[in-house]
């Protein structure tokens, strides 16, 4: 109990202290209409240094936010700042700096037309008007500028100002103007107008009653006659008679002193009067005797000082209220100051000050005003600032408004830091944009190179097939016999004519080899396998062949000998395509030193062109020597790479007279073709002349006419999922596709399609009404059955690949009953036709051409349906890739506007040309093949797209942006989220669209099925009764456009 009492005593003591503090400071607190927060008021009145530091920090935070604000609503910062100042500076004055804050706010937001109808901006002006010398001028200025003319508060405050000046006629005119302008809220304005009329009527009645009372009072009091004759009285001294009435009459109590009337003796010219004490007492008693008179009105209570009405001091004041006494008592006696200073001891106790101490560091109430500062009207300063800003021609070279604006000044370093951060941010964004553009350009180049590579590979495969069908002789080769008269002389060199023939043959073969290898060099690089020496252990243990002279010491073969027939079939290629080094001067020193160009038979490693050509022949770091029996036994012989000195026939052995014997060994050389004779194993002459003689003792050579590069190590590049050949191979491996009842395969060419002609699909004839869409690989036609006006859609493809039918079949298989789209496919030799059953022909592209029918309700319905459709596609692991308006058909919900249970049946997809089945197509591919990515090319958000599923999310966002703003998607990065460049707040139900775009653009690595389901559920919550009624009206108008007759005549 004692503890409870102690706590209660402490609490009451604290409350008493707060009450004392409030009682000492309440007369300095300015009242607010909306009231004050008590906790903030107590902290503001505490007058502590810690509280003051907190206020200064908060004020500096507001100033910093105002200077470097980058959002879309700067008025919000000013509104919060001024509201905070009103609450934390209850005493007002110079310390709050309210007038300067309001001037800065209205000057900063003066050019923002969007705030002219904002109640917050009008509130700033009204607060500034209370500080102006002439508030009416401020209201006239606002009315001329069009600020707040659509708000009721503007007219209410304006009329109150006129009412305070008792100009009721003008105030009523202001109310009437506001009602005529239909200011919002109109009900509040009308209510204030009625209250104003009631107040004016009450004041008028009171004034009439007061005038009647004054007239009755004046009639009962004697009146002074106008222009009365004033006759003088007396013989010697003429005196004018005095006629006084009303309050000018002399009171009886005033007969004393100097104003007493003269006695009778003085009137009878008696000069000496003897004082009679008794007579004076009797007269005094008679005069002082009170007389009973009735009260005309009850006395006014004069103890209450706050109930008196202010008025003039010199009228209407009766003599009874004047101070009594002689005139001597009315003379002010000046105070006489002593000529000395009284002594005060130092130990004397000083008088106690009040508990509310004013800290001089916080309150500057008694500080002197700066002499150079002039006090002007805030409205005039705002107007002059506006005029100066319009006429301003000079440009400050530093951020003057950021340094000197507000209470606290910012240093140049802080301003430079902010400018540097801003430039750095812009520079990073520019770098990201540049890198994205370079990446897109490189990707485009890679795609073009892959396309060229596919064409070249297709051509090579066709040529290889043709060559394998032809029968070629096994030993049909062209031999070049070199006849020389100096056969007996071993040191004789080759003639120049023979060298020229051999050189021409070699250059022709090399040109063809490089032409065949060049397309492969442009494709994606395939890493070569590292050579493993342990894999050759079995080959090392093999015994050497029985016929050593027939062993060829050579590396791994890199060229294939072709027959003359195959050579002649390839000679129609233009020579400028064959070799990229044609016409290039090789960098050789022979022409400089000897004066002529050295022509060699073998590749010269010192020749730059030969070196570049040979670099393409290199595969692995090391090559082993293969024997003849290890070579393939096909009619095409393998040519050694560099050892041309080896004898290859018995005639050569007889001509040269020497048979070289060598052992089977493994030779390891570098990948660069070295200029050495390690593989020749010539006779061991040590002299240079001997080596020259040995190498030049070639009598006859076997030189092929053409060389063809082998493709043993080449691998197939990554197939594109949109390639028709790849899709054809994929569909051939699916037996369930051909077994489907909806697929009809006909072994004949596709019939020719013409407008107003009939085509047979199944067992029915259809008439082609219109060619709706023409694309690169397919067309869309509107057809109708014979003797019927019901239109439907067929898709005609130029490739015999029923990809759309395959996607529909997989959706039906994986989604079961959730997918209700029916279509049939007719496959021909040179194309296929997909017939979509039970759908309309009116696409979303047609609806966009009639933008006046696209209301908010229609947009919500279309996006909701699109979210549900794409959610089903992603559940089936299928990415559409082209959610454009041309492939979206309006269906049942549009034609049956009053069936509210079919809100998810408003759209249907009829084109799956860019779709990818991720369950089957497992190869890695680039996202640039999707049409959605091609449409949004250049957007930075595509650089963060890591999953194919996100492409459909961007497609939905782009379609919603197209419906709302009639243009494709434009986004920007604000530091944390991707947002639209357009202003969403101006749209109807802008909060819903803001959440939609932020969520769908920032899905990142989340599962797209959950994101789509969440957005669809949020969209579905909008379909209430009011929304459905508006939607039905809009659908009824759209239904007129979707009729078959209206479609055909568009």
From Swiss-Prot:
Induction: Induced during mitosis. Kinase activity stimulated by CENPE. It comes from the Eukaryota. Keywords: Acetylation, Apoptosis, ATP-binding, Cell cycle, Cell division, Centromere, Chromosome, Cytoplasm, Cytoskeleton, Disease variant, Kinase, Kinetochore, Mitosis, Nucleotide-binding, Nucleus, Phosphoprotein, Serine/threonine-protein kinase, Transferase, Tumor suppressor, Ubl conjugation. InterPro entries: Bub1/Mad3 (IPR015661), Kinase-like_dom_sf (IPR011009), Mad3/Bub1_I (IPR013212). It catalyses: L-seryl-[protein] + ATP = O-phospho-L-seryl-[protein] + ADP + H(+); L-threonyl-[protein] + ATP = O-phospho-L-threonyl-[protein] + ADP + H(+). Changing residue 579 to E: Abolishes the cleavage by caspase-3. A motif (Nuclear localization signal) lies at residues 111-118. Changing residue 15 to T: In a colorectal cancer cell line. Changing residue 175 to A: Loss of interaction with KNL1. ATP binds at residues 772-780, 795. Interacts with CENPE. Interacts with PLK1. Part of a complex containing BUB3, CDC20 and BUB1B. Interacts with anaphase-promoting complex/cyclosome (APC/C). Interacts with KNL1. Interacts with KAT2B. Interacts with RIPK3. Interacts with the closed conformation form of MAD2L1. Belongs to the protein kinase superfamily. Ser/Thr protein kinase family. BUB1 subfamily. This is Mitotic checkpoint serine/threonine-protein kinase BUB1 beta. The gene is BUB1B.
